[in-house]
From Swiss-Prot:
Keyword Signal found: no
Molecular function via GO: chorismate synthase activity; FMN binding
Cellular component, GO, one term: cytosol
Protein name: Chorismate synthase
Enzyme Commission identifier(s): 4.2.3.5
UniProt binding sites for NADP(+): 48, 54
Native species: Hahella chejuensis (strain KCTC 2396)
GO BP annotations listed: amino acid biosynthetic process; aromatic amino acid family biosynthetic process; chorismate biosynthetic process
Amino acid sequence: MSGNTFGKLFTVTTFGESHGLALGCIVDGCPPGLPLTEEDLQVDLDRRKPGTSRHTTQRREPDQVRILSGVFEGKTTGTPIGLLIENTDQKSKDYSNIKDQFRPAHADYAYWHKYGVRDYRGGGRSSARETAMRVAAGAIAKKFLQTVYGVRIRGYLSQLGPIKVEKVDWSIVNDNPFFCPDADKIPEMEKYMDALRKEGDSIGAKITVVAEGVPPGLGEPIFDRLDADLAHALMSINAVKGVEIGAGFDVVEQKGTEHRDEMTPEGFLSNNAGGVLGGISSGQDVIAHMALKPTSSLRLPGKSIDVNGDPVEVITTGRHDPCVGIRATPIAEAMMAMVLMDHLLRHRGQNADVKVDTPDIAAIARVKAQD
């Protein structure tokens, strides 16, 4: 398996399986001198961890992270940062009945054909449990971006099944189990998920993530465009089946006069581009959306085959999220942070001395908005 490392200058390599002893990662490329503690990482890990509400998996993992290296006297040293989270609530026997069976729409079948062996306990390496380490690594990137450059990254659940958010109040996002920014929609989501759980079924979701204060100039055309790398990062998250930048697929119905983000000395008049022009950040908010499929691990019987190709009826009895999107917001934030951190370091290495006389109109607009 050769695809376990993300990034070029700010790199994150994760390891571990859902029911293994522990999960871990190595973060390399973080500049020295950044104040960093385990508590800094734990905030986002607690937002992501399982068992925090009746609407998520009841597997209860504390997800306590340990910093093994790369930090001395409370500051990063510039050397690789080693992180570890122990697994404490595995119930591998729950998966014994599917040892030789493939769950429909799960990674089981593809992993078997690629590797000839698979860890059937909770999906092994293909489990979304792996994302705990992404969140821990992303928290480092988020702190650097916020501390050094004033970049703020935050996200929210913008759609759960048929329920679409209609307004965004950032102040309530972390005060409900859905990361929902629309207070009027939370009771509706609660009712919907309670009914879904009784049915034994699952549902998909959509997450929106926004980076504010991103300087213009991040992104490396042609093949490492900022939006291309964002799409790559978000698509690498378990269950993600689609990514949009800015207006996304709505551009199909927009006319050019509507889509173009016109400019004035006071700022941009719209942000259909999602903060990226020509693969390079424009200084506007970077906005991305991702769609997550419903989990395929269900207690409802489904048709499949076993390792011999014979027909079987599959029932999954382990503990699973009825909607994986509910806990995906911190993961999306982490991946966006890692992309922006990597591109900022690349930009700083090659283009730090580039100066132009044209004002940063997005920054001007932000200042005026604060007045």
